[in-house]
Amino acid sequence: MLEQMGIAAKQASYKLAQLSSREKNRVLEKIADELEAQSESILNANAQDVADARANGLSDAMLDRLALTPARLKGIADDVRQVCNLADPVGQVIDGGVLDSGLRLERRRVPLGVIGVIYEARPNVTVDVASLCLKTGNAVILRGGKETCRTNAATVAVIQDALNSCGLPAGAVQAIDNPDRALVSELLRMDKYIDMLIPRGGAGLHKLCREQSTIPVITGGIGVCHIYVDESAEIAEALKVIVNAKTQRPSTCNTVETLLVNKNIADSFLPALSKQMAESGVTLHADAGALAQLQTGPAKVVAVKAEEYDDEFLSLDLNVKIVSDLDDAIAHIREHGTQHSDAILTRDMRNAQRFVNEVDSSAVYVNASTRFTDGGQFGLGAEVAVSTQKLHARGPMGLEALTTYKWIGIGDYTIRA
């Protein structure tokens, strides 16, 4: 089965690579329209997936990731339209010039070819990834979580209908609908057809891909994100940022998981934090330095376990740790962070600059929420993933991250001397 999918994807990629920006946008507009026109079939499939997931005991965080509503589906369609409005990087001349020999040389952006994406129970990823791949002239093979098999099948069927109506092969966007995990191992060895693999899931999936894949892998999406509250932070303003970073949508990878509080502000900050977190329904996992004081407040508090500093809660849970100073905060982030998104809240711009320079994450913020690490917020449109590695792409992966380049030399029967 996968062999045939690979062949179809490779053949489709050749045709996609030749499309103009106008032709690609026409396809995307058709997909957006069809997602809305056929929303009932997608929502019905999703309702079945959610019911099965609930019966199987999936957590509230996972159910939130899985669920589609009419508003969310409309938002997904609107995201596709936003991709239409983005500049097409394919064909862009990055740099170039004329050599002494007279050869005119340029470095031009081109599609990668075929992209494989393995992802968790988030049905919006199916459309986000497909739209970005099509915009950049790439074919894609999708392997979503078993919890979303019906939703993904219905969504990809709609996308393939749109492709066919525009005269393009259905092989441009395909989904593996068999939940057999053995197929993942087979997918990892399809370097004959797939040019880049993006796993979006837990540490176990990332480890499997790094160890078994014969395809170049871009890893990311695990977000143990931190906010450091410096001693000069404005408490009222800091709390607004923390509430946003923790509670706006707790199931996302850019949600803050650990709050590091400077010891010199702790006495005034912790009572205010407890009140705010109680109102937001957040459970605090406090270290020894913060536990006693937080236990006198209204928020639910438990003693933090050492291993929880490495946890991506994806829920209304927040670690709270007292640190001595900026150095202590940076050391903690280096030990427990995942190089995703980290922030400092401070009025001391020297500390802010040190934090920016010394915290080695894909996104670092000063006086802002970690929730901004998102392709749409960055003006990149929908994202394929948030890369936490350093080669090829880092941070939210928009259109440029789905391209490579080729060198083109144009001469007049020019020979090398």
Swiss-Prot record:
Gene Ontology CC terms, in alphabetical order: cytoplasm
Superkingdom classification of source: Bacteria
Pfam families membership: Aldedh
Pathway of action: Amino-acid biosynthesis; L-proline biosynthesis; L-glutamate 5-semialdehyde from L-glutamate: step 2/2
InterPro entries, per the entry: Ald_DH/histidinol_DH, Ald_DH_C, Ald_DH_N, Aldehyde_DH_dom, G-glutamylP_reductase_CS, Glu-5-SA_DH, GPR_dom
Reaction it catalyzes: L-glutamate 5-semialdehyde + phosphate + NADP(+) = L-glutamyl 5-phosphate + NADPH + H(+)
CDD domains: ALDH_F18-19_ProA-GPR (cd07079)
Function according to Swiss-Prot or TrEMBL: Catalyzes the NADPH-dependent reduction of L-glutamate 5-phosphate into L-glutamate 5-semialdehyde and phosphate. The product spontaneously undergoes cyclization to form 1-pyrroline-5-carboxylate.
Protein's UniProt name: Gamma-glutamyl phosphate reductase
Organism: Escherichia fergusonii (strain ATCC 35469 / DSM 13698 / CCUG 18766 / IAM 14443 / JCM 21226 / LMG 7866 / NBRC 102419 / NCTC 12128 / CDC 0568-73)
